[in-house]
Protein backbone atom coordinates (compact mmCIF):
# COMPACT_ATOMS: atom_id res chain seq x y z
CA UNK A 1 0.00 0.00 0.00
CA UNK A 2 1.49 3.31 -1.09
CA UNK A 3 0.70 5.88 1.59
CA UNK A 4 2.73 8.86 2.85
CA UNK A 5 3.80 8.71 6.48
CA UNK A 6 1.42 10.58 8.77
CA UNK A 7 2.21 12.62 11.91
CA UNK A 8 1.23 10.03 14.56
CA UNK A 9 3.39 7.30 16.12
CA UNK A 10 1.56 4.51 17.95
CA UNK A 11 2.52 1.35 19.82
CA UNK A 12 1.47 -2.30 19.72
CA UNK A 13 0.67 -4.80 22.45
CA UNK A 14 2.76 -7.90 21.89
CA UNK A 15 5.21 -9.93 19.82
CA UNK A 16 3.25 -9.80 16.55
CA UNK A 17 0.54 -7.63 15.00
CA UNK A 18 -3.13 -8.26 15.65
CA UNK A 19 -5.71 -7.55 12.97
CA UNK A 20 -6.81 -4.45 14.88
CA UNK A 21 -3.22 -3.23 14.97
CA UNK A 22 -2.79 -3.87 11.26
CA UNK A 23 -5.82 -1.69 10.63
CA UNK A 24 -4.53 1.03 12.97
CA UNK A 25 -1.09 1.03 11.35
CA UNK A 26 -2.73 1.38 7.94
CA UNK A 27 -4.47 4.62 8.93
CA UNK A 28 -3.26 7.58 6.80
CA UNK A 29 -2.37 9.65 9.89
CA UNK A 30 -0.01 6.98 11.27
CA UNK A 31 3.64 7.34 10.34
CA UNK A 32 5.51 5.28 12.90
CA UNK A 33 5.54 2.60 15.58
CA UNK A 34 7.36 2.68 18.92
CA UNK A 35 8.39 -0.65 20.43
CA UNK A 36 8.82 -1.51 24.10
CA UNK A 37 10.22 -4.39 26.13
CA UNK A 38 6.84 -6.12 25.94
CA UNK A 39 7.34 -6.40 22.16
CA UNK A 40 10.62 -8.29 22.46
CA UNK A 41 10.95 -12.05 22.98
CA UNK A 42 14.16 -12.71 21.07
CA UNK A 43 16.05 -11.37 18.07
CA UNK A 44 14.41 -13.75 15.58
CA UNK A 45 10.94 -12.67 16.74
CA UNK A 46 11.91 -8.98 16.68
CA UNK A 47 13.18 -9.23 13.10
CA UNK A 48 9.95 -10.94 12.06
CA UNK A 49 7.89 -8.22 13.77
CA UNK A 50 9.73 -5.34 12.13
CA UNK A 51 9.53 -7.08 8.74
CA UNK A 52 5.77 -7.45 9.25
CA UNK A 53 5.44 -3.76 10.10
CA UNK A 54 7.61 -2.66 7.19
CA UNK A 55 5.61 -4.75 4.73
CA UNK A 56 2.36 -2.93 5.52
CA UNK A 57 3.13 0.27 3.66
CA UNK A 58 5.41 2.09 1.23
CA UNK A 59 7.29 4.08 2.41
CA UNK A 60 7.54 1.87 5.48
CA UNK A 61 6.40 3.10 8.86
CA UNK A 62 9.27 4.41 11.00
CA UNK A 63 10.10 1.92 13.75
CA UNK A 64 11.52 3.45 16.92
CA UNK A 65 12.54 2.42 20.42
CA UNK A 66 13.96 3.96 23.60
CA UNK A 67 17.33 2.21 23.67
CA UNK A 68 19.76 4.59 25.38
CA UNK A 69 21.71 2.28 27.67
CA UNK A 70 21.67 1.74 31.41
CA UNK A 71 18.13 1.48 32.76
CA UNK A 72 16.62 2.58 29.44
CA UNK A 73 17.48 -0.33 27.17
CA UNK A 74 14.35 -2.08 25.95
CA UNK A 75 16.02 -5.09 24.34
CA UNK A 76 18.50 -7.10 26.39
CA UNK A 77 18.78 -10.80 25.47
CA UNK A 78 21.09 -11.08 22.46
CA UNK A 79 21.98 -7.37 22.52
CA UNK A 80 25.13 -5.78 23.91
CA UNK A 81 24.41 -4.35 27.33
CA UNK A 82 24.95 -0.60 27.00
CA UNK A 83 26.26 1.59 29.82
CA UNK A 84 24.41 4.56 31.27
CA UNK A 85 25.78 7.72 29.70
CA UNK A 86 27.24 8.88 33.01
CA UNK A 87 29.91 6.20 32.53
CA UNK A 88 31.09 8.10 29.46
CA UNK A 89 31.04 11.33 31.45
CA UNK A 90 33.28 9.74 34.06
CA UNK A 91 35.60 8.57 31.28
CA UNK A 92 35.66 12.18 30.01
CA UNK A 93 36.93 13.37 33.38
CA UNK A 94 39.78 10.85 33.20
CA UNK A 95 40.78 11.04 29.51
CA UNK A 96 38.80 13.13 27.04
CA UNK A 97 40.15 11.61 23.85
CA UNK A 98 39.51 8.08 25.07
CA UNK A 99 36.01 9.05 26.23
CA UNK A 100 35.15 10.39 22.78
CA UNK A 101 36.32 7.15 21.16
CA UNK A 102 34.22 5.14 23.60
CA UNK A 103 31.15 7.32 22.99
CA UNK A 104 31.47 6.83 19.23
CA UNK A 105 31.81 3.08 19.72
CA UNK A 106 28.75 2.94 22.00
CA UNK A 107 26.70 4.77 19.38
CA UNK A 108 27.95 2.47 16.64
CA UNK A 109 27.13 -0.74 18.50
CA UNK A 110 23.77 0.59 19.67
CA UNK A 111 22.70 1.59 16.16
CA UNK A 112 24.11 -1.34 14.19
CA UNK A 113 22.47 -3.93 16.43
CA UNK A 114 19.10 -2.19 16.08
CA UNK A 115 19.58 -1.67 12.34
CA UNK A 116 20.18 -5.41 12.00
CA UNK A 117 16.72 -5.93 13.48
CA UNK A 118 14.96 -3.55 11.10
CA UNK A 119 14.66 -0.65 13.54
CA UNK A 120 15.10 2.87 12.17
CA UNK A 121 15.56 4.98 15.25
CA UNK A 122 16.47 5.01 18.92
CA UNK A 123 15.35 8.06 20.87
CA UNK A 124 18.87 8.95 21.94
CA UNK A 125 21.08 10.72 23.03
CA UNK A 126 19.93 12.30 26.27
CA UNK A 127 21.24 15.88 26.16
CA UNK A 128 19.99 16.88 29.61
CA UNK A 129 22.61 18.17 32.02
CA UNK A 130 23.13 16.24 35.23
CA UNK A 131 22.30 18.90 37.81
CA UNK A 132 21.96 16.10 40.41
CA UNK A 133 18.36 17.18 40.96
CA UNK A 134 16.27 14.92 38.70
CA UNK A 135 16.17 11.21 39.56
CA UNK A 136 14.43 10.22 36.33
CA UNK A 137 17.37 11.69 34.39
CA UNK A 138 20.21 10.89 36.79
CA UNK A 139 22.82 8.64 35.22
CA UNK A 140 21.08 8.83 31.83
CA UNK A 141 22.87 12.19 31.43
CA UNK A 142 26.49 12.32 30.32
CA UNK A 143 27.69 15.09 32.63
CA UNK A 144 26.92 18.39 34.32
CA UNK A 145 29.21 20.41 32.02
CA UNK A 146 27.52 21.51 28.75
CA UNK A 147 30.82 21.19 26.88
CA UNK A 148 31.28 17.59 28.03
CA UNK A 149 27.68 16.69 27.15
CA UNK A 150 28.02 18.34 23.74
CA UNK A 151 31.29 16.64 22.85
CA UNK A 152 30.29 13.18 24.07
CA UNK A 153 26.85 13.37 22.47
CA UNK A 154 28.34 14.51 19.17
CA UNK A 155 30.73 11.55 19.24
CA UNK A 156 27.85 9.21 20.04
CA UNK A 157 25.87 10.78 17.20
CA UNK A 158 28.75 10.03 14.82
CA UNK A 159 28.68 6.42 15.99
CA UNK A 160 24.95 6.21 15.46
CA UNK A 161 25.50 7.41 11.91
CA UNK A 162 28.14 4.75 11.32
CA UNK A 163 25.57 2.23 12.51
CA UNK A 164 22.97 3.47 10.03
CA UNK A 165 20.89 5.63 12.36
CA UNK A 166 20.08 9.29 12.88
CA UNK A 167 20.10 10.81 16.37
CA UNK A 168 17.25 12.22 18.46
CA UNK A 169 18.34 14.64 21.18
CA UNK A 170 16.15 14.86 24.26
CA UNK A 171 14.57 16.32 26.40
CA UNK A 172 14.61 19.82 24.88
CA UNK A 173 15.31 22.40 26.31
CA UNK A 174 16.53 20.38 29.31
CA UNK A 175 14.87 18.12 31.91
CA UNK A 176 17.83 17.87 34.26
CA UNK A 177 17.19 20.91 36.46
CA UNK A 178 13.73 19.90 37.71
CA UNK A 179 13.11 17.42 40.50
CA UNK A 180 9.89 15.88 39.19
CA UNK A 181 9.33 13.09 36.67
CA UNK A 182 7.12 14.19 33.77
CA UNK A 183 5.84 10.62 33.43
CA UNK A 184 3.90 11.27 36.65
CA UNK A 185 3.47 15.05 37.02
CA UNK A 186 4.18 18.40 35.38
CA UNK A 187 7.66 19.56 36.50
CA UNK A 188 8.41 23.28 36.52
CA UNK A 189 11.73 25.00 35.85
CA UNK A 190 11.67 28.64 36.99
CA UNK A 191 14.93 29.75 35.37
CA UNK A 192 15.07 32.52 32.80
CA UNK A 193 15.71 31.90 29.12
CA UNK A 194 19.16 33.46 29.50
CA UNK A 195 20.04 30.96 32.24
CA UNK A 196 18.78 28.02 30.21
CA UNK A 197 20.60 29.23 27.09
CA UNK A 198 23.85 29.52 29.00
CA UNK A 199 23.78 25.87 30.06
CA UNK A 200 21.05 23.44 29.01
CA UNK A 201 20.52 24.65 25.44
CA UNK A 202 24.21 24.39 24.54
CA UNK A 203 24.18 20.67 23.61
CA UNK A 204 21.01 21.04 21.53
CA UNK A 205 22.51 23.90 19.53
CA UNK A 206 25.82 22.08 19.12
CA UNK A 207 24.26 18.85 17.89
CA UNK A 208 21.86 20.72 15.61
CA UNK A 209 24.91 22.22 13.91
CA UNK A 210 26.42 18.73 13.66
CA UNK A 211 23.44 17.19 11.87
CA UNK A 212 21.15 15.94 14.64
CA UNK A 213 18.20 14.20 13.01
CA UNK A 214 15.46 14.79 15.55
CA UNK A 215 14.58 16.42 18.86
CA UNK A 216 12.13 15.35 21.55
CA UNK A 217 10.89 18.16 23.81
CA UNK A 218 10.26 17.78 27.53
CA UNK A 219 6.85 17.81 29.16
CA UNK A 220 8.23 20.51 31.48
CA UNK A 221 6.92 24.01 32.14
CA UNK A 222 9.31 26.97 31.94
CA UNK A 223 7.03 29.84 33.08
CA UNK A 224 9.65 32.56 32.65
CA UNK A 225 9.70 31.70 28.93
CA UNK A 226 6.15 30.58 28.08
CA UNK A 227 2.90 29.59 29.79
CA UNK A 228 2.84 26.29 27.85
CA UNK A 229 5.09 23.28 28.53
CA UNK A 230 7.90 22.94 26.02
CA UNK A 231 6.21 20.17 24.05
CA UNK A 232 3.17 22.38 23.44
CA UNK A 233 5.01 25.69 23.15
CA UNK A 234 5.36 27.55 19.87
CA UNK A 235 7.91 29.77 21.62
CA UNK A 236 10.17 26.82 22.42
CA UNK A 237 9.62 24.77 19.26
CA UNK A 238 9.08 27.27 16.46
CA UNK A 239 10.64 30.52 17.67
CA UNK A 240 13.69 29.18 19.53
CA UNK A 241 14.41 25.66 18.19
CA UNK A 242 13.53 26.30 14.55
CA UNK A 243 14.19 30.05 14.47
CA UNK A 244 17.14 30.86 16.72
CA UNK A 245 18.89 27.50 16.81
CA UNK A 246 18.10 26.75 13.16
CA UNK A 247 17.14 23.11 13.67
CA UNK A 248 15.50 21.58 10.58
CA UNK A 249 15.02 17.95 11.60
CA UNK A 250 12.04 16.09 13.04
CA UNK A 251 10.43 17.24 16.28
CA UNK A 252 8.82 14.25 18.03
CA UNK A 253 6.49 14.91 20.94
CA UNK A 254 7.21 12.93 24.09
CA UNK A 255 4.45 10.42 24.82
CA UNK A 256 1.06 12.12 25.08
CA UNK A 257 -0.11 9.66 27.75
CA UNK A 258 2.42 11.05 30.25
CA UNK A 259 1.04 13.03 33.18
CA UNK A 260 3.10 16.00 32.06
CA UNK A 261 0.94 16.18 28.93
CA UNK A 262 -2.44 15.84 30.62
CA UNK A 263 -2.91 19.58 31.12
CA UNK A 264 -3.35 20.00 27.37
CA UNK A 265 -6.73 18.22 27.51
CA UNK A 266 -8.01 15.18 25.65
CA UNK A 267 -5.69 13.15 23.44
CA UNK A 268 -7.00 14.94 20.37
CA UNK A 269 -6.42 18.30 22.07
CA UNK A 270 -2.93 17.23 23.13
CA UNK A 271 -2.05 16.19 19.60
CA UNK A 272 -3.58 19.37 18.15
CA UNK A 273 -1.59 21.52 20.58
CA UNK A 274 1.70 19.70 19.95
CA UNK A 275 1.35 19.84 16.16
CA UNK A 276 0.27 23.50 16.23
CA UNK A 277 3.31 24.37 18.36
CA UNK A 278 5.67 22.81 15.84
CA UNK A 279 5.90 19.06 16.47
CA UNK A 280 6.15 16.95 13.33
CA UNK A 281 5.03 13.69 14.91
CA UNK A 282 3.15 12.92 18.14
CA UNK A 283 3.53 9.73 20.20
CA UNK A 284 0.44 7.98 21.57
CA UNK A 285 1.31 4.96 23.71
CA UNK A 286 -0.57 2.44 25.88
CA UNK A 287 -3.99 3.76 25.01
CA UNK A 288 -5.21 1.97 21.85
CA UNK A 289 -8.79 3.16 22.26
CA UNK A 290 -7.60 6.75 22.70
CA UNK A 291 -5.31 6.33 19.71
CA UNK A 292 -8.20 5.16 17.55
CA UNK A 293 -10.43 8.01 18.73
CA UNK A 294 -7.66 10.50 18.05
CA UNK A 295 -6.99 9.12 14.56
CA UNK A 296 -10.70 9.46 13.79
CA UNK A 297 -10.92 13.08 14.97
CA UNK A 298 -7.50 14.64 14.38
CA UNK A 299 -7.18 17.22 11.61
CA UNK A 300 -3.46 18.01 11.48
CA UNK A 301 -2.21 21.32 10.07
CA UNK A 302 -0.42 21.37 6.71
CA UNK A 303 3.05 19.84 7.08
CA UNK A 304 4.80 20.39 3.74
CA UNK A 305 8.18 19.22 5.08
CA UNK A 306 6.93 16.16 6.97
CA UNK A 307 7.68 13.55 4.29
CA UNK A 308 11.22 14.79 3.71
CA UNK A 309 12.02 15.06 7.42
CA UNK A 310 10.68 11.61 8.25
CA UNK A 311 12.48 10.04 5.29
CA UNK A 312 15.78 11.32 6.71
CA UNK A 313 15.09 9.29 9.85
CA UNK A 314 14.41 6.05 7.96
CA UNK A 315 17.13 3.41 7.84
CA UNK A 316 18.74 3.36 4.41
CA UNK A 317 20.26 -0.14 4.40
CA UNK A 318 18.59 -3.52 4.61
CA UNK A 319 18.58 -5.34 7.93
CA UNK A 320 20.35 -8.25 6.23
CA UNK A 321 23.31 -6.01 5.39
CA UNK A 322 23.66 -5.04 9.03
CA UNK A 323 23.30 -8.66 10.11
CA UNK A 324 26.36 -9.50 8.04
CA UNK A 325 28.29 -6.57 9.51
CA UNK A 326 27.56 -7.41 13.14
CA UNK A 327 28.89 -10.93 12.52
CA UNK A 328 32.40 -9.62 11.69
CA UNK A 329 35.42 -9.77 14.03
CA UNK A 330 35.75 -5.98 13.95
CA UNK A 331 32.23 -5.55 15.24
CA UNK A 332 32.80 -8.18 17.91
CA UNK A 333 35.75 -6.09 19.13
CA UNK A 334 33.51 -3.01 19.31
CA UNK A 335 30.92 -4.99 21.27
CA UNK A 336 33.58 -6.16 23.71
CA UNK A 337 34.74 -2.58 24.31
CA UNK A 338 31.18 -1.49 25.07
CA UNK A 339 30.45 -4.52 27.23
CA UNK A 340 33.34 -3.61 29.50
CA UNK A 341 31.64 -0.30 30.29
CA UNK A 342 28.33 -1.80 31.37
CA UNK A 343 27.19 -3.95 34.25
CA UNK A 344 23.87 -5.83 34.46
CA UNK A 345 22.91 -3.72 37.49
CA UNK A 346 22.88 -0.64 35.24
CA UNK A 347 19.54 -1.75 33.82
CA UNK A 348 18.05 -1.67 37.33
CA UNK A 349 19.81 1.27 39.01
CA UNK A 350 17.46 4.19 39.65
CA UNK A 351 13.81 4.75 38.78
CA UNK A 352 12.50 2.76 35.84
CA UNK A 353 11.72 5.02 32.91
CA UNK A 354 8.70 4.76 30.67
CA UNK A 355 8.48 0.97 30.69
CA UNK A 356 4.79 1.15 31.49
CA UNK A 357 4.40 3.35 28.42
From Swiss-Prot:
UniProt keyword list: Cell cycle, Cell division, Cell shape, Cell wall biogenesis/degradation, Cytoplasm, Glycosidase, Hydrolase, Peptidoglycan synthesis
InterPro entries per UniProt: Beta_hexosaminidase_bac (IPR022956), Glyco_hydro_3_AS (IPR019800), Glyco_hydro_3_N (IPR001764), Glyco_hydro_3_N_sf (IPR036962), Glycoside_hydrolase_SF (IPR017853), NagZ_Beta-hexosaminidase (IPR050226)
Positions annotated as active site in the UniProt record: 183, 254
Places the protein is found: Cytoplasm
UniProt binding sites for substrate: 66, 74, 140, 170-171
SUPFAM superfamilies: (Trans)glycosidases
Catalytic activity: Hydrolysis of terminal non-reducing N-acetyl-D-hexosamine residues in N-acetyl-beta-D-hexosaminides
Highest taxon of the lineage: Bacteria
Chief site of localization: cytoplasm
A single GO cellular-component term on record: cytoplasm
Family: Belongs to the glycosyl hydrolase 3 family. NagZ subfamily.
HAMAP family: NagZ
Function: Plays a role in peptidoglycan recycling by cleaving the terminal beta-1,4-linked N-acetylglucosamine (GlcNAc) from peptide-linked peptidoglycan fragments, giving rise to free GlcNAc, anhydro-N-acetylmuramic acid and anhydro-N-acetylmuramic acid-linked peptides.
NCBIfam families, A to Z: PRK05337.1
Protein name per the record: Beta-hexosaminidase
Organism of this sequence: Chromobacterium violaceum (strain ATCC 12472 / DSM 30191 / JCM 1249 / CCUG 213 / NBRC 12614 / NCIMB 9131 / NCTC 9757 / MK)
Designated gene of the protein: nagZ
